[in-house]
């Protein structure tokens, strides 16, 4: 068969996930109160992630709430670890370069991997790998404007086979605000992890900061990881982690995933890669509802980049849309996939 194929490891995972998903497609189960999709996760895989002692001092963990830029951060760090050389990101699928801690094929259950290991997690802090907190392993938490997260997660739920149908835009927004979506409440997630700020081995950075100054953000990440880069290598990291470069790289754009996991007919996994797209989707009423819940939930916390831009006009990198009635969260999108 022509073209690159998923590795055998992923084929094994696909078979296991598909078998479970066919039995309870679109169903969630709860692990310690948090909803998880059946198939990709099991109580056993979550317990392994939480309780394993298989943590090394030079491990690197990327932690995010879903649809907050996980894959963008993976690409950046993979390039940093290779001094800007794009060979790795062009030859190995992104999910294998940075496996997940909590999935049915867990990063902790894979054959021995060389250090430094790069791993990802969507887990809230109370379910995260306990051994990491007593180690020197580095944790990078990437946050994103929750309004954009809602839009991206809504569209992703339409193409990810193992997720519940999102229902109407209004239903999905209400479920998101109540934490009745995969991995639970965004508010609880970020409030839990933000407490780690100030620890030497913890870096909090946002999707918006990456967009506003990718080069400066990469330099900050390099400093945190103790891996300084020269100007040429730094420029290579910035160039090869740009959204257009990732979207063109079939090792990073998820086009290798089979239809049993991702319905490519419904849209692309990497959708727009911008900040502020929620303004093209939220109605005035939805925006007001969201703002009220946000103020109540985030009271007393430091401000974030999206707080300063919430009242700005157009999304970053976009021209001001022509004035027309807001179509709401489910506006027709020519490419309704998911942001990074």
UniProtKB/Swiss-Prot annotation:
The keyword Transferase applies. It catalyses: an alcohol + 3'-phosphoadenylyl sulfate = an alkyl sulfate + adenosine 3',5'-bisphosphate + H(+); pregnenolone + 3'-phosphoadenylyl sulfate = pregnenolone sulfate + adenosine 3',5'-bisphosphate + H(+); 3beta-hydroxyandrost-5-en-17-one + 3'-phosphoadenylyl sulfate = dehydroepiandrosterone 3-sulfate + adenosine 3',5'-bisphosphate + H(+); cholesterol + 3'-phosphoadenylyl sulfate = cholesterol sulfate + adenosine 3',5'-bisphosphate + H(+). One of its GO terms (cellular component) is cytoplasm. Substrate binds at residues 95, 100. Isoform 1 is expressed in skin and testis. Higher level of isoform 2 expressed in skin and intestine, moderate level in the kidney, low level in liver, stomach and placenta. The keyword Amino-acid biosynthesis does not apply. 3'-phosphoadenylyl sulfate binds at residues 67-72, 144, 152, 207, 241-246, 271-273. GO terms for molecular function: cholesterol binding; cholesterol sulfotransferase activity; nucleic acid binding; small molecule binding; steroid hormone binding; steroid sulfotransferase activity; sulfotransferase activity. Its EC number is 2.8.2.2. Its main location: cytoplasm. The active site is at 122 (proton acceptor). Keywords: Cytoplasm, Endoplasmic reticulum, Lipid metabolism, Microsome, Nucleus, Steroid metabolism, Transferase. Coiled coil: none annotated. It comes from the Eukaryota. Residues 301-340 are annotated as: Disordered. GO terms for biological process: 3'-phosphoadenosine 5'-phosphosulfate metabolic process; cholesterol metabolic process; negative regulation of cell population proliferation; positive regulation of epidermal cell differentiation; steroid metabolic process; sulfate assimilation; sulfation. It holds the Pfam family Sulfotransfer_1. It is found in: Cytoplasm, Cytosol; Microsome; Nucleus. Sulfotransferase that utilizes 3'-phospho-5'-adenylyl sulfate (PAPS) as sulfonate donor to catalyze the sulfate conjugation. Sulfonation increases the water solubility of most compounds, and therefore their renal excretion, but it can also result in bioactivation to form active metabolites. Sulfonates cholesterol. Catalyzes sulfation of the 3beta-hydroxyl groups of steroids, such as, pregnenolone and dehydroepiandrosterone (DHEA). Conjugates efficiently cholesterol but has a greater affinity for pregnenolone sulfation. Does not show high activity with DHEA. Belongs to the sulfotransferase 1 family. PANTHER family: SULFOTRANSFERASE SULT. This is Sulfotransferase 2B1. It comes from Rattus norvegicus.
